[in-house]
Amino acid sequence: MKTTLVIMAAGIGSRFGGGIKQLAPVGLNGEIIMDYSIHDAIEAGFNKIVFIIRKDIKDAFKEVIGDRIEKICKDLDVEIAYAYQELSELPEGVELPEGRTKPWGTGQAVLACKEVLHEPFAVINADDYYGKEAFVKLHDFLVGYAPEKANQFCMAGFILKNTLSENGAVTRGICETNEEGYLTAVHETSNIVKTPEGAAVDNDGQLTSINAESYASMNMWGLTPEFMQTLEDGFKAFFANMGNKDILKAEYLLPIYIDELLQAGRVSVKVLDTNDKWFGVTYKEDKDYVVKSFARLIEAGVYQKNLFEDLK
């Protein structure tokens, strides 16, 4: 079965270079975090990759990342496709509000794939390292897809303590699950900091402890092809319900929309737990830690020095 990895990379800056965190080299041969996600997805069995970018960065993206990955994937019989998130791509009858410059969010980003997505798929952020286990579990879930399972989704559930930064506060989707391991709610929680006891929310210096063993969503979802129509319907409703005061800043966010569907009883989301440690460059100070972490993984034999060598 065809299974696709969708990489949300439209947030990459329009200038490529040392200042763009998504393109900061972290591997021994200049690999970026995205390289490791692509490697792990292919190793797990994904056989198609869709990059969501913006048209204004297409040439630079292909020069820095895309062409190199296309060559690797061609040799591995993995299909590559592009989708473009644009501010002006709106539902029929909706005009771009004057003065709007902010992108419409991750929901619109995934919706940009509508013409190239016809199979079960996983969605990830371009600049997060998720570890190998989550890709294997998502792939194994997605290959069980059938049309009668159109509303059965999954997500990778990371342990909160494995997703925190040593260098400052982070925002995470704290998850509630039932006894069967299905998601019941996602609470977007800001200002989470690492503490000697585990984790806490920092409210202007007032720390409130939270369970560091909670599941956290890192925007790694397993979804079905039918979801694309639901997502489009949701985007139309997003505009229909939006007040004028929100028109310049409101965002259509994937986890919030999935939670709306969940609360309405329209979908189920199986939480696939992973004990892998998440890495990301939330703060510039995180980069050294990420580089050292990949060096340790290579030393331990988790990855080859030449990253894609073991897939050939």
Q: What are the language-model segments listed below?
A:
Residues 263, 268, 278-280, 284-312:
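Hydrophobic helical membrane-anchoring modules
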